[in-house]
Amino acid sequence: MKLILDFFPILLFFGAYKLADIYTATGVLMAATVLQMGIIYAMERKLQAMQKATLVLILLFGTLTLVLHDDRFIKWKPTVLYGAMAIALAVALWALKKNFLKMLLGSQLQLPDRIWGRLNVAWIGYCLFMAAINGYVAAYFTTEAWVNFKLWGYVFPIVFLVAQGLYISPHLKNDEPSV
């Protein structure tokens, strides 16, 4: 159910683009994201900071796209989001000496501090990579190529998360005694 909910807006966006155009797809994306966040809120009684940021940026850049009839805004939204995430993680880690990943996930994953530090740096690199690649595709390719990239580009986070899981699994602290 969660996987379907996660992909719901992008699949509707892709379908609306194929059936109509980028402006219809943008409106569908905005509506689907509001619905998605409403469902998440109804199920969990809260939205994570990242979910809130995504919603605000989709509504902001989507509105600009529709009002100004300029698809560059919706195409640049992922670059802004990933860039902001990279900056937030980097400032927190190096200026504030805080590890946001550990703060968010530390209650769920018991890892040594050095592993949390490496994960944080990996996320900074990943976000910078995603911001750069989206910016490149948005700037130098057609809208159709960008829409296809958005759909098939979901392979990047899957590969990153699998690699991250493989990296952290030997470092997980197990509180249960061995039999």
UniProtKB/Swiss-Prot annotation:
Signal peptide: none annotated. Keywords: Cell inner membrane, Cell membrane, Membrane, Transmembrane, Transmembrane helix. GO terms for cellular component: plasma membrane. The keyword Amino-acid biosynthesis does not apply. The chain crosses the membrane at residues 24-44, 49-69, 76-96, 121-141, 151-171. InterPro entries: YciB. It is found in: Cell inner membrane. It is a multi-pass membrane protein. It comes from the Bacteria. Belongs to the YciB family. HAMAP family: YciB. This is Inner membrane-spanning protein YciB. It comes from Variovorax paradoxus (strain S110).
